[in-house]
Amino acid sequence: MSIENLKEALPEYAKDLKLNLGTVARGTVLSQSQLWGTLVATAAATRNEQVFKEIREEAAGILTPEALDAALGAASIMAMTNVFYRGRGFLDGAYDDLRPGLRMNIIGNPGVDKSEFELWSFAVSTINGCHYCVGSHEKVLREAGLTREQVLEALKIAAIVAGVAQALATVPALV
């Protein structure tokens, strides 16, 4: 189970994704923990079992158990908060004065460096399409000292993983 397995499973029409996935997994401007946490969190966010399984199994040999749990926690909590804040945004401010009333304790105590958790949350929020959360997480990341290049790299990883998941979802229908 690995990135290589995902690359091999991609059809020819997804060759660009195959190349991009290989490039980003070999190393980036992110630390190994930032990179693999972003890969795990975004793989979980795609809801594609094959993509998640392959990435998670390789990441388990790189990330600490705490970082692996935190990456999955980022995907889970963002699944909830992205829907809430994106949905509230559709209501033109009519509900902005009300408390969400949602537990989000993992955001304050993720079990890993908070900037890593924010990076993973940012990447998942891009997949989930919540521009409020994307903007909020980007601001926190920049204030924490991450560079524009690091933030953009997480965005790029999210885009690649989402593309890989979409391409692999079509393969069974082609046979």
Curated annotation (Swiss-Prot):
MF GO annotations: alkyl hydroperoxide reductase activity; disulfide oxidoreductase activity; hydroperoxide reductase activity; peroxiredoxin activity
Residues of the active site: 130, 133
GO process annotations (BP): cell redox homeostasis; response to oxidative stress
Enzyme class: oxidoreductase
Keyword line: Antioxidant, Disulfide bond, Oxidoreductase, Peroxidase, Redox-active center
Superkingdom, taxonomy of origin: Bacteria
Entry annotated with the keyword Metal-binding: no
Disulfide bond positions: 130-133
Enzyme Commission number, as recorded: 1.11.1.28
Pfam families cross-referenced by the UniProt entry: CMD (PF02627)
UniProt record similarity statement: Belongs to the AhpD family.
Function comment: Antioxidant protein with alkyl hydroperoxidase activity. Required for the reduction of the AhpC active site cysteine residues and for the regeneration of the AhpC enzyme activity.
Binding partners and assembly: Homotrimer.
UniProt protein name: Alkyl hydroperoxide reductase AhpD
Species classification: Bacteria, Bacillati, Actinomycetota, Actinomycetes, Mycobacteriales
Gene label: ahpD
